[in-house]
Amino acid sequence: MSNNSRLPENGVQSGNGEDAELKKSMRIIEREIPDSLLEKIPEAEDYIALQDLERKLDSLIVRKRFDLQDSLSRNSHKTRILRMYIHSTVANQSWQQKGENQENNSGDINSLPIPEWTLHIEGRLLVNPDDEDDKAFELAPFTNFFRKIAIQILRSDDLYPSGNYVEWNKLPDNSNTSNGITVTRKGDQSVDVKIMLYPEEHPERYKLSKAFANILGIREGTRPDIVSYLWQYIKFHRLQDMEEKRLINCDKALRDLFEADRLYFPRIPELMNRFLEPIDPIVIPYTINVSEHTVEKVTIFDIRINTEDPRHSQIRSFLATMMSQDKIRSIDDKLTELIQAITYSQSKYDFMKKFSESPIEFINEWIESQSRDLEIVLDGTNMNYAEKRSADYYQQPWVHESAFHYLNLLNSKKQQSVLNASAKK
Protein backbone atom coordinates (compact mmCIF):
# COMPACT_ATOMS: atom_id res chain seq x y z
CA MET A 1 0.00 0.00 0.00
CA SER A 2 1.62 3.19 -1.18
CA ASN A 3 0.28 5.55 1.47
CA ASN A 4 0.66 3.60 4.68
CA SER A 5 2.25 6.59 6.35
CA ARG A 6 -0.97 8.56 5.99
CA LEU A 7 -3.16 6.00 7.69
CA PRO A 8 -4.47 6.93 11.14
CA GLU A 9 -2.21 5.53 13.80
CA ASN A 10 -3.42 2.76 16.04
CA GLY A 11 -2.38 4.22 19.37
CA VAL A 12 -3.14 0.97 21.18
CA GLN A 13 -0.09 -0.82 22.41
CA SER A 14 0.00 -4.23 23.98
CA GLY A 15 1.91 -4.67 27.19
CA ASN A 16 2.92 -8.22 26.33
CA GLY A 17 6.17 -7.11 24.70
CA GLU A 18 7.14 -4.94 27.68
CA ASP A 19 6.29 -7.73 30.13
CA ALA A 20 8.42 -10.17 28.16
CA GLU A 21 11.36 -7.75 28.12
CA LEU A 22 10.97 -7.15 31.88
CA LYS A 23 10.96 -10.88 32.63
CA LYS A 24 13.97 -11.37 30.37
CA SER A 25 15.92 -8.60 32.13
CA MET A 26 15.02 -10.10 35.52
CA ARG A 27 16.32 -13.49 34.38
CA ILE A 28 19.57 -11.85 33.24
CA ILE A 29 20.02 -10.23 36.68
CA GLU A 30 19.34 -13.53 38.45
CA ARG A 31 22.05 -15.19 36.34
CA GLU A 32 24.71 -12.61 37.26
CA ILE A 33 27.47 -13.72 39.64
CA PRO A 34 27.63 -11.36 42.67
CA ASP A 35 30.70 -9.10 42.78
CA SER A 36 31.71 -10.57 46.13
CA LEU A 37 32.24 -13.96 44.49
CA LEU A 38 34.21 -12.88 41.45
CA GLU A 39 37.59 -13.14 43.19
CA LYS A 40 36.74 -16.43 44.88
CA ILE A 41 35.61 -18.33 41.76
CA PRO A 42 38.42 -18.87 39.23
CA GLU A 43 35.98 -19.63 36.40
CA ALA A 44 33.93 -16.44 36.98
CA GLU A 45 35.81 -14.48 34.28
CA ASP A 46 35.08 -17.20 31.71
CA TYR A 47 31.40 -17.15 32.69
CA ILE A 48 31.24 -13.35 32.28
CA ALA A 49 32.94 -13.62 28.88
CA LEU A 50 30.33 -16.18 27.80
CA GLN A 51 27.56 -13.84 28.96
CA ASP A 52 29.03 -11.01 26.84
CA LEU A 53 29.13 -13.35 23.86
CA GLU A 54 25.52 -14.38 24.52
CA ARG A 55 24.41 -10.74 24.51
CA LYS A 56 26.16 -10.14 21.18
CA LEU A 57 24.55 -13.25 19.69
CA ASP A 58 21.12 -12.20 20.98
CA SER A 59 21.52 -8.78 19.39
CA LEU A 60 22.62 -10.31 16.08
CA ILE A 61 19.76 -12.85 16.09
CA VAL A 62 17.18 -10.15 16.79
CA ARG A 63 18.46 -8.04 13.88
CA LYS A 64 18.41 -11.04 11.55
CA ARG A 65 14.92 -11.99 12.71
CA PHE A 66 13.65 -8.49 11.89
CA ASP A 67 15.30 -8.71 8.46
CA LEU A 68 13.63 -12.06 7.77
CA GLN A 69 10.24 -10.80 8.92
CA ASP A 70 10.65 -7.77 6.68
CA SER A 71 11.42 -10.03 3.71
CA LEU A 72 8.21 -11.98 4.37
CA SER A 73 6.17 -8.77 4.25
CA ARG A 74 7.24 -8.10 0.67
CA ASN A 75 4.78 -9.46 -1.86
CA SER A 76 6.67 -11.82 -4.17
CA HIS A 77 3.83 -13.92 -5.57
CA LYS A 78 3.72 -15.27 -9.09
CA THR A 79 0.92 -17.11 -10.90
CA ARG A 80 2.04 -20.53 -12.11
CA ILE A 81 0.36 -23.54 -13.73
CA LEU A 82 -0.09 -26.72 -11.70
CA ARG A 83 -0.79 -29.76 -13.86
CA MET A 84 -2.85 -32.45 -12.18
CA TYR A 85 -3.08 -36.09 -13.25
CA ILE A 86 -6.17 -37.95 -12.05
CA HIS A 87 -6.95 -41.59 -12.74
CA SER A 88 -8.52 -44.58 -11.04
CA THR A 89 -7.71 -48.26 -10.70
CA VAL A 90 -10.01 -51.10 -9.72
CA ALA A 91 -9.68 -54.50 -8.08
CA ASN A 92 -11.93 -57.53 -7.66
CA GLN A 93 -14.58 -56.17 -10.03
CA SER A 94 -17.04 -58.62 -11.59
CA TRP A 95 -15.38 -58.50 -15.01
CA GLN A 96 -12.02 -59.21 -13.35
CA GLN A 97 -13.33 -62.08 -11.24
CA LYS A 98 -15.18 -63.70 -14.17
CA GLY A 99 -12.01 -64.95 -15.71
CA GLU A 100 -10.60 -66.10 -12.39
CA ASN A 101 -13.80 -68.04 -11.57
CA GLN A 102 -13.69 -69.82 -14.93
CA GLU A 103 -10.14 -70.89 -14.25
CA ASN A 104 -10.88 -72.04 -10.70
CA ASN A 105 -14.36 -73.44 -11.52
CA SER A 106 -15.56 -72.04 -8.21
CA GLY A 107 -19.25 -71.28 -7.82
CA ASP A 108 -19.11 -70.02 -4.22
CA ILE A 109 -20.03 -66.32 -4.33
CA ASN A 110 -19.24 -65.79 -0.63
CA SER A 111 -15.62 -66.68 -1.20
CA LEU A 112 -15.13 -63.89 -3.74
CA PRO A 113 -13.16 -60.81 -2.61
CA ILE A 114 -14.99 -57.49 -2.20
CA PRO A 115 -14.78 -55.18 -5.23
CA GLU A 116 -12.96 -51.89 -4.69
CA TRP A 117 -11.56 -48.93 -6.54
CA THR A 118 -8.69 -46.50 -5.91
CA LEU A 119 -8.57 -42.82 -6.86
CA HIS A 120 -5.12 -41.41 -7.66
CA ILE A 121 -4.48 -37.65 -7.59
CA GLU A 122 -1.01 -36.42 -8.54
CA GLY A 123 0.43 -33.21 -9.84
CA ARG A 124 3.49 -31.12 -10.54
CA LEU A 125 4.23 -27.51 -11.27
CA LEU A 126 5.05 -26.61 -14.86
CA VAL A 127 8.43 -24.89 -14.65
CA ASN A 128 10.62 -23.04 -17.07
CA PRO A 129 14.11 -24.62 -17.01
CA ASP A 130 15.67 -21.25 -17.79
CA ASP A 131 13.93 -19.49 -14.89
CA GLU A 132 15.95 -19.66 -11.66
CA ASP A 133 12.84 -19.07 -9.54
CA ASP A 134 11.00 -21.91 -11.27
CA LYS A 135 13.83 -24.35 -10.63
CA ALA A 136 13.16 -24.11 -6.90
CA PHE A 137 9.67 -25.53 -7.50
CA GLU A 138 10.80 -28.37 -9.73
CA LEU A 139 10.97 -30.93 -6.93
CA ALA A 140 8.24 -29.44 -4.74
CA PRO A 141 5.67 -32.11 -3.74
CA PHE A 142 2.14 -31.78 -5.08
CA THR A 143 0.42 -31.24 -1.72
CA ASN A 144 2.92 -28.54 -0.76
CA PHE A 145 0.81 -25.99 -2.69
CA PHE A 146 -2.38 -26.64 -0.70
CA ARG A 147 -3.40 -26.17 2.90
CA LYS A 148 -6.32 -28.58 2.52
CA ILE A 149 -7.57 -31.11 0.00
CA ALA A 150 -11.05 -32.59 0.37
CA ILE A 151 -12.71 -35.35 -1.65
CA GLN A 152 -16.49 -35.78 -1.59
CA ILE A 153 -17.75 -39.13 -2.92
CA LEU A 154 -21.24 -38.57 -4.32
CA ARG A 155 -23.01 -41.79 -3.42
CA SER A 156 -25.69 -42.96 -1.02
CA ASP A 157 -24.80 -42.72 2.65
CA ASP A 158 -27.28 -45.51 3.36
CA LEU A 159 -25.44 -48.01 1.17
CA TYR A 160 -21.99 -46.67 2.07
CA PRO A 161 -22.34 -45.07 5.52
CA SER A 162 -18.69 -44.26 6.12
CA GLY A 163 -15.80 -42.83 4.18
CA ASN A 164 -17.71 -40.68 1.70
CA TYR A 165 -15.76 -37.58 2.72
CA VAL A 166 -11.97 -37.54 2.87
CA GLU A 167 -9.91 -34.55 4.02
CA TRP A 168 -6.18 -33.93 4.09
CA ASN A 169 -4.79 -30.99 6.08
CA LYS A 170 -1.28 -29.67 5.84
CA LEU A 171 0.72 -29.66 9.07
CA PRO A 172 2.47 -26.43 10.13
CA ASP A 173 5.92 -28.00 9.73
CA ASN A 174 5.13 -29.41 6.23
CA SER A 175 6.00 -32.90 7.45
CA ASN A 176 3.03 -34.59 5.75
CA THR A 177 3.44 -33.30 2.19
CA SER A 178 3.63 -35.85 -0.64
CA ASN A 179 3.59 -36.14 -4.42
CA GLY A 180 0.04 -37.41 -4.53
CA ILE A 181 -3.07 -38.62 -2.74
CA THR A 182 -4.74 -42.00 -3.08
CA VAL A 183 -8.18 -42.96 -1.79
CA THR A 184 -9.39 -46.58 -1.77
CA ARG A 185 -13.02 -47.51 -1.16
CA LYS A 186 -15.30 -50.52 -1.57
CA GLY A 187 -17.64 -50.42 -4.56
CA ASP A 188 -18.61 -52.11 -7.81
CA GLN A 189 -20.41 -49.20 -9.46
CA SER A 190 -19.15 -46.07 -11.19
CA VAL A 191 -19.37 -43.02 -8.96
CA ASP A 192 -18.89 -39.26 -9.25
CA VAL A 193 -16.47 -37.49 -6.92
CA LYS A 194 -15.84 -33.83 -6.21
CA ILE A 195 -12.22 -32.85 -5.57
CA MET A 196 -11.91 -29.58 -3.63
CA LEU A 197 -8.51 -27.88 -3.52
CA TYR A 198 -7.70 -25.11 -1.03
CA PRO A 199 -4.47 -23.38 -2.16
CA GLU A 200 -2.07 -22.20 0.51
CA GLU A 201 -1.46 -18.48 0.25
CA HIS A 202 0.57 -16.06 2.36
CA PRO A 203 -1.01 -13.73 3.23
CA GLU A 204 -4.35 -15.49 3.02
CA ARG A 205 -7.00 -14.10 0.67
CA TYR A 206 -10.64 -13.66 1.66
CA LYS A 207 -13.93 -13.31 -0.20
CA LEU A 208 -15.92 -10.16 0.59
CA SER A 209 -19.63 -10.16 1.29
CA LYS A 210 -21.80 -8.75 -1.51
CA ALA A 211 -22.48 -5.43 0.26
CA PHE A 212 -18.83 -4.96 1.25
CA ALA A 213 -17.65 -5.86 -2.26
CA ASN A 214 -20.01 -3.31 -3.82
CA ILE A 215 -18.55 -0.56 -1.62
CA LEU A 216 -14.88 -1.35 -2.29
CA GLY A 217 -15.21 -2.56 -5.87
CA ILE A 218 -13.30 -5.80 -5.27
CA ARG A 219 -14.54 -9.35 -4.72
CA GLU A 220 -11.58 -10.78 -2.85
CA GLY A 221 -8.22 -9.77 -1.42
CA THR A 222 -5.80 -10.04 1.47
CA ARG A 223 -6.46 -8.21 4.71
CA PRO A 224 -3.91 -5.44 3.98
CA ASP A 225 -5.38 -4.98 0.50
CA ILE A 226 -8.94 -4.76 1.85
CA VAL A 227 -7.95 -2.19 4.49
CA SER A 228 -6.11 -0.22 1.81
CA TYR A 229 -9.16 -0.14 -0.49
CA LEU A 230 -11.36 0.88 2.43
CA TRP A 231 -8.94 3.68 3.33
CA GLN A 232 -8.99 4.90 -0.28
CA TYR A 233 -12.81 4.92 -0.13
CA ILE A 234 -12.73 6.93 3.11
CA LYS A 235 -10.30 9.48 1.67
CA PHE A 236 -12.20 9.82 -1.60
CA HIS A 237 -15.48 10.53 0.21
CA ARG A 238 -13.75 12.67 2.89
CA LEU A 239 -15.16 10.67 5.78
CA GLN A 240 -12.24 11.17 8.16
CA ASP A 241 -13.14 13.36 11.13
CA MET A 242 -11.41 16.74 10.98
CA GLU A 243 -10.65 16.93 14.72
CA GLU A 244 -10.17 13.31 15.77
CA LYS A 245 -8.31 11.74 12.85
CA ARG A 246 -8.89 8.19 14.08
CA LEU A 247 -12.66 8.57 13.80
CA ILE A 248 -14.53 7.88 10.57
CA ASN A 249 -17.90 9.53 9.91
CA CYS A 250 -19.88 6.89 8.03
CA ASP A 251 -21.79 7.71 4.88
CA LYS A 252 -24.99 5.81 4.06
CA ALA A 253 -23.18 2.81 2.55
CA LEU A 254 -20.85 2.33 5.53
CA ARG A 255 -23.66 3.08 7.98
CA ASP A 256 -25.81 0.34 6.47
CA LEU A 257 -22.86 -2.07 6.46
CA PHE A 258 -21.38 -1.51 9.93
CA GLU A 259 -24.66 -0.35 11.54
CA ALA A 260 -22.92 2.61 13.18
CA ASP A 261 -22.65 6.35 12.57
CA ARG A 262 -18.96 6.57 13.41
CA LEU A 263 -16.09 4.09 13.32
CA TYR A 264 -12.83 3.99 15.24
CA PHE A 265 -10.34 3.28 12.46
CA PRO A 266 -7.93 1.05 14.46
CA ARG A 267 -10.89 -1.27 15.11
CA ILE A 268 -11.88 -1.61 11.45
CA PRO A 269 -9.72 -4.74 10.81
CA GLU A 270 -11.62 -6.39 13.65
CA LEU A 271 -15.04 -5.08 12.61
CA MET A 272 -14.72 -6.24 9.02
CA ASN A 273 -14.20 -9.89 10.03
CA ARG A 274 -17.92 -10.61 9.75
CA PHE A 275 -17.89 -9.51 6.11
CA LEU A 276 -15.00 -11.80 5.12
CA GLU A 277 -15.24 -15.45 4.17
CA PRO A 278 -12.64 -18.02 3.09
CA ILE A 279 -11.96 -18.13 -0.63
CA ASP A 280 -14.02 -20.74 -2.48
CA PRO A 281 -11.98 -23.85 -3.21
CA ILE A 282 -10.99 -25.02 -6.67
CA VAL A 283 -13.55 -27.73 -7.47
CA ILE A 284 -12.72 -30.50 -9.95
CA PRO A 285 -15.50 -32.97 -10.87
CA TYR A 286 -14.37 -36.48 -11.76
CA THR A 287 -16.09 -39.79 -12.47
CA ILE A 288 -14.60 -43.05 -11.26
CA ASN A 289 -15.59 -45.60 -13.89
CA VAL A 290 -15.19 -49.25 -12.93
CA SER A 291 -15.97 -50.69 -16.38
CA GLU A 292 -13.37 -52.75 -18.17
CA HIS A 293 -12.47 -50.35 -20.97
CA THR A 294 -12.24 -47.06 -19.05
CA VAL A 295 -10.01 -47.71 -16.04
CA GLU A 296 -6.51 -46.27 -15.76
CA LYS A 297 -7.25 -43.53 -18.30
CA VAL A 298 -5.48 -40.41 -17.06
CA THR A 299 -7.39 -37.13 -17.01
CA ILE A 300 -5.28 -33.96 -16.99
CA PHE A 301 -6.32 -30.67 -15.40
CA ASP A 302 -4.32 -27.42 -15.44
CA ILE A 303 -5.06 -24.98 -12.62
CA ARG A 304 -3.59 -21.57 -11.86
CA ILE A 305 -2.18 -21.04 -8.38
CA ASN A 306 -0.35 -18.15 -6.75
CA THR A 307 3.05 -19.27 -5.55
CA GLU A 308 5.44 -17.34 -3.37
CA ASP A 309 9.18 -17.39 -3.10
CA PRO A 310 10.04 -20.97 -2.06
CA ARG A 311 12.44 -19.62 0.52
CA HIS A 312 9.55 -18.03 2.42
CA SER A 313 8.29 -21.36 3.76
CA GLN A 314 11.79 -22.14 5.03
CA ILE A 315 11.97 -18.69 6.63
CA ARG A 316 8.62 -19.23 8.39
CA SER A 317 9.73 -22.60 9.74
CA PHE A 318 12.99 -21.06 10.93
CA LEU A 319 11.21 -18.15 12.62
CA ALA A 320 8.78 -20.54 14.32
CA THR A 321 11.76 -22.49 15.66
CA MET A 322 13.40 -19.28 16.88
CA MET A 323 10.27 -18.23 18.77
CA SER A 324 10.16 -21.57 20.59
CA GLN A 325 12.85 -21.15 23.24
CA ASP A 326 11.75 -23.72 25.82
CA LYS A 327 15.19 -25.35 25.89
CA ILE A 328 16.95 -21.99 26.34
CA ARG A 329 14.57 -21.03 29.16
CA SER A 330 15.23 -24.38 30.83
CA ILE A 331 18.99 -23.77 30.69
CA ASP A 332 18.52 -20.21 32.02
CA ASP A 333 16.46 -21.55 34.93
CA LYS A 334 19.17 -24.10 35.67
CA LEU A 335 21.81 -21.35 35.65
CA THR A 336 19.69 -19.28 38.03
CA GLU A 337 19.43 -22.23 40.43
CA LEU A 338 23.20 -22.76 40.30
CA ILE A 339 23.93 -19.07 40.97
CA GLN A 340 21.52 -19.13 43.92
CA ALA A 341 23.18 -22.29 45.24
CA ILE A 342 26.63 -20.68 44.94
CA THR A 343 25.41 -17.55 46.75
CA TYR A 344 23.87 -19.65 49.53
CA SER A 345 27.07 -21.71 49.90
CA GLN A 346 29.12 -18.51 50.10
CA SER A 347 26.85 -17.20 52.87
CA LYS A 348 27.32 -20.43 54.83
CA TYR A 349 31.07 -20.24 54.29
CA ASP A 350 31.26 -16.63 55.53
CA PHE A 351 29.12 -17.53 58.54
CA MET A 352 31.30 -20.47 59.60
CA LYS A 353 34.56 -18.64 58.90
CA LYS A 354 33.66 -15.69 61.14
CA PHE A 355 32.51 -18.08 63.83
CA SER A 356 35.81 -20.01 63.70
CA GLU A 357 37.91 -16.84 63.93
CA SER A 358 36.18 -15.35 67.01
CA PRO A 359 33.32 -17.47 68.39
CA ILE A 360 32.33 -15.23 71.34
CA GLU A 361 32.39 -11.97 69.42
CA PHE A 362 30.56 -13.57 66.50
CA ILE A 363 27.78 -14.99 68.73
CA ASN A 364 27.28 -11.61 70.42
CA GLU A 365 27.04 -9.83 67.06
CA TRP A 366 24.70 -12.50 65.75
CA ILE A 367 22.38 -12.19 68.77
CA GLU A 368 22.39 -8.42 68.42
CA SER A 369 21.51 -8.73 64.75
CA GLN A 370 18.68 -11.14 65.52
CA SER A 371 17.36 -8.76 68.16
CA ARG A 372 17.25 -5.91 65.67
CA ASP A 373 15.35 -8.12 63.26
CA LEU A 374 12.90 -9.01 66.01
CA GLU A 375 12.33 -5.32 66.76
CA ILE A 376 11.52 -4.73 63.10
CA VAL A 377 9.05 -7.61 63.13
CA LEU A 378 7.41 -6.15 66.24
CA ASP A 379 6.99 -2.75 64.53
CA GLY A 380 9.90 -1.17 66.29
CA THR A 381 8.66 -1.84 69.83
CA ASN A 382 11.49 -1.27 72.31
CA MET A 383 12.32 -4.37 74.31
CA ASN A 384 13.93 -4.12 77.74
CA TYR A 385 15.91 -7.35 78.09
CA ALA A 386 16.99 -6.52 81.67
CA GLU A 387 13.33 -6.32 82.71
CA LYS A 388 12.65 -9.74 81.23
CA ARG A 389 15.22 -11.29 83.56
CA SER A 390 13.02 -10.37 86.57
CA ALA A 391 10.21 -12.70 87.76
CA ASP A 392 7.88 -9.72 88.27
CA TYR A 393 7.79 -9.26 84.49
CA TYR A 394 5.88 -12.53 84.18
CA GLN A 395 3.37 -11.69 86.93
CA GLN A 396 1.68 -8.97 84.88
CA PRO A 397 -2.04 -9.37 83.95
CA TRP A 398 -1.38 -9.80 80.23
CA VAL A 399 0.72 -12.89 80.96
CA HIS A 400 -2.17 -14.61 82.77
CA GLU A 401 -4.59 -13.59 80.02
CA SER A 402 -2.28 -14.92 77.31
CA ALA A 403 -1.81 -18.19 79.20
CA PHE A 404 -5.61 -18.53 79.57
CA HIS A 405 -6.20 -18.07 75.85
CA TYR A 406 -3.36 -20.41 74.98
CA LEU A 407 -4.72 -23.20 77.24
CA ASN A 408 -8.22 -22.69 75.80
CA LEU A 409 -6.79 -23.05 72.33
CA LEU A 410 -5.06 -26.31 73.25
CA ASN A 411 -8.26 -27.62 74.84
CA SER A 412 -10.30 -26.73 71.73
CA LYS A 413 -7.84 -28.53 69.47
CA LYS A 414 -7.97 -31.62 71.69
CA GLN A 415 -11.79 -31.64 71.69
CA GLN A 416 -11.84 -31.24 67.91
CA SER A 417 -9.45 -34.16 67.45
CA VAL A 418 -11.67 -36.36 69.67
CA LEU A 419 -14.76 -35.40 67.64
CA ASN A 420 -12.99 -36.14 64.38
CA ALA A 421 -11.85 -39.54 65.65
CA SER A 422 -15.39 -40.46 66.75
CA ALA A 423 -16.81 -39.31 63.42
CA LYS A 424 -14.43 -41.59 61.52
CA LYS A 425 -15.59 -44.56 63.60
Curated annotation (Swiss-Prot):
<keyword id="KW-0805">Transcription regulation</keyword>
<dbReference type="GO" id="GO:0016586">
    <property type="term" value="C:RSC-type complex"/>
</dbReference>
<dbReference type="GO" id="GO:0016514">
    <property type="term" value="C:SWI/SNF complex"/>
</dbReference>
<dbReference type="Pfam" id="PF02201">
    <property type="entry name" value="SWIB"/>
</dbReference>
<comment type="subunit">
    <text>Component of the RSC complex composed of at least arp9, arp42, rsc1, rsc4, rsc7, rsc9, rsc58, sfh1, snf21, ssr1, ssr2, ssr3 and ssr4. The complex interacts with histone and histone variant components of centromeric chromatin. Component of the SWI/SNF global transcription activator complex composed of at least arp9, arp42, snf5, snf22, snf30, sbf59, sol1, ssr1, ssr2, ssr3, ssr4 and tfg3.</text>
</comment>
<comment type="similarity">
    <text>Belongs to the SMARCD family.</text>
</comment>
<protein>
    <recommendedName>
        <fullName>SWI/SNF and RSC complexes subunit ssr3</fullName>
    </recommendedName>
</protein>
<dbReference type="InterPro" id="IPR019835">
    <property type="entry name" value="SWIB_domain"/>
</dbReference>
<feature type="region of interest" description="Disordered">
    <location>
        <begin position="1"/>
        <end position="23"/>
    </location>
</feature>
<dbReference type="GO" id="GO:0006357">
    <property type="term" value="P:regulation of transcription by RNA polymerase II"/>
</dbReference>
<keyword id="KW-0804">Transcription</keyword>
<dbReference type="GO" id="GO:0005634">
    <property type="term" value="C:nucleus"/>
</dbReference>
<keyword id="KW-0156">Chromatin regulator</keyword>
<feature type="domain" description="SWIB/MDM2">
    <location>
        <begin position="201"/>
        <end position="278"/>
    </location>
</feature>
<dbReference type="InterPro" id="IPR003121">
    <property type="entry name" value="SWIB_MDM2_domain"/>
</dbReference>
<comment type="function">
    <text>Component of the chromatin structure remodeling complex (RSC), which is involved in transcription regulation and nucleosome positioning. Controls particularly membrane and organelle development genes. Part of the SWI/SNF complex, an ATP-dependent chromatin remodeling complex, required for the positive and negative regulation of gene expression of a large number of genes. It changes chromatin structure by altering DNA-histone contacts within a nucleosome, leading eventually to a change in nucleosome position, thus facilitating or repressing binding of gene-specific transcription factors.</text>
</comment>
<dbReference type="GO" id="GO:0005829">
    <property type="term" value="C:cytosol"/>
</dbReference>
<keyword id="KW-0539">Nucleus</keyword>
<dbReference type="InterPro" id="IPR036885">
    <property type="entry name" value="SWIB_MDM2_dom_sf"/>
</dbReference>
<dbReference type="GO" id="GO:0006338">
    <property type="term" value="P:chromatin remodeling"/>
</dbReference>
<keyword id="KW-0963">Cytoplasm</keyword>
<dbReference type="GO" id="GO:0000785">
    <property type="term" value="C:chromatin"/>
</dbReference>
<feature type="compositionally biased region" description="Polar residues">
    <location>
        <begin position="1"/>
        <end position="16"/>
    </location>
</feature>
<dbReference type="GO" id="GO:0045815">
    <property type="term" value="P:transcription initiation-coupled chromatin remodeling"/>
</dbReference>
